[in-house]
């Protein structure tokens, strides 16, 4: 599915990623974790094309995408969920879901995507994307957009950021449902134990290098290191 070969990245004379070699398998829930400043979010942005590596190659389904811009990577089937979702002024929730799907969709279809993330469609479908929506609501709307897009690979950059406990519990439910019903691949950047606990594979990043690979059955050892 996704392969990174010898990826390195530096900024302001500081080495952030150093010779990263990584394979992400299809139809798996993979989590990249590690201490703050280890390069996790930078790695996610490099995969999406928001940052350009200083060296190395990125392959998606066998195709070299190292030099492809964000929009072309999105067209190939890579989706990205930000730590803080963007508020699109003047658009409704339905507008965003329709834009994400790439097609004109019926109201009941859009409502189904909202239901998938635990939102009451009648209350949200025509709402404006504005400051009245909480961080947790925006996060789930963004996930509904990604479900509508049906990305082959969806990247979540610290999905727990900026949301309350109730919203986080709902987020875990959404991830568990996506994992059990979707044939697509999920890559999450997170240090939250409950997200690590549902991962098929856990990759530990420290000081810009991969130091270990494991799974949730070895979670206690991971968290103690």
Task: Indicate residue ranges for each PLM-predicted region.
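Walker B catalytic motif
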Residues: 158-159
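ABC ATPase NBD coupling module
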Residues: 64-79
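Conserved ABC transporter NBD signature motif
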Residues: 56-63, 76, 109
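Q-loop/switch helix immediately C-terminal to the Walker
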Residues: 84, 90-106
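Conserved structural motif at the start of ABC-family nucleotide-binding domains
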Residues: 2, 16-19
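Helix-to-loop junction immediately C-terminal to a conserved catalytic motif
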Residues: 48
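The feature captures the beta-strand-to-loop junction immediately N-terminal to the Walker
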Residues: 33-35
């Amino acid at each position: 599915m996704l392969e990174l070969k010898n990826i390195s990245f530096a900024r302001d004379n500081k080495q952030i990623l150093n010779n990263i070699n990584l394979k992400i398998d299809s139809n798996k829930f993979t989590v990249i974790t590690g201490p703050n400043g280890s390069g996790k979010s930078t790695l996610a942005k490099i995969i999406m094309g928001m940052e350009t590596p200083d060296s190395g190659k990125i392959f998606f389904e066998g195709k070299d995408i190292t030099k492809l811009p964000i929009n072309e990577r999105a067209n190939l089937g890579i989706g990205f969920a930000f730590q803080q979702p963007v508020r699109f002024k003047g658009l409704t929730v339905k507008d965003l879901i329709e834009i994400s799907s790439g097609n004109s969709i019926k109201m009941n279809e859009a409502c189904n995507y909202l239901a998938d993330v635990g939102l009451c469609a009648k209350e949200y479908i025509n709402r404006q994307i504005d400051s009245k929506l909480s961080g947790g609501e925006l996060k789930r709307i963004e996930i509904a957009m990604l479900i509508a897009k049906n990305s082959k690979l969806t990247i979540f950059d610290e999905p727990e950021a900026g949301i309350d406990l109730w919203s986080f519990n709902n987020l875990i439910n959404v991830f568990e449902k996506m994992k059990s019903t979707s044939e697509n691949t999920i890559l999450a950047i997170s240090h939250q134990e409950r997200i690590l606990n549902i991962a098929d594979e856990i990759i530990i990043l420290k000081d810009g290098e991969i130091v270990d690979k494991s799974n949730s059955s070895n979670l206690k050892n991971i968290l103690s290191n």
